Amino acid sequence: MKKYLLEAAQLARGFMPHEEGMSLYEIALQVAPRSAILEVGSYCGKSTIYLGAAARETGSTVFTIDHHRGSEEMQRGWAHHDSELVDRDSGLMDSLPELRRNLEKTSLNDVVVPIIGDSLVVARHWAGDISMLFIDGGHGPVPAHSDYESWASKVTRGGFM
């Protein structure tokens, strides 16, 4: 992984330990050439940078889906709430500007396509196969299972979930 991307990933807001990010990167390098990578839940883009680095090296694309309003534990009054990510006009959590800044800083805009919305809605309309699925959206059992049920059948044979 290029040094500037590694440094950007380590500095990006997020909760993924570096070792897990490197595992994502290594797996993506192996499966990405087959078809696209899909990430459910990008937050500010920490894991997206690891995946995007692999996509850059393999000529693949990362599609990352997030509504950018935060999962339950990121809301006001919860342990992982970050008041710096609250939109001043709406008063709602909004991690999209931070994701965009991270994609600009890393020049990964040409290999990462953010999709703003609910993953279940996007899944109903998704027509292509994916070689790698990384589910890190809603962390409760119901949202995580719903994401799995909606996306698992779209992973190609020999792909990774």
Identify the function of each model-found stretch.
Residues K2-M161:
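S-adenosylmethionine/decaboxylated-SAM
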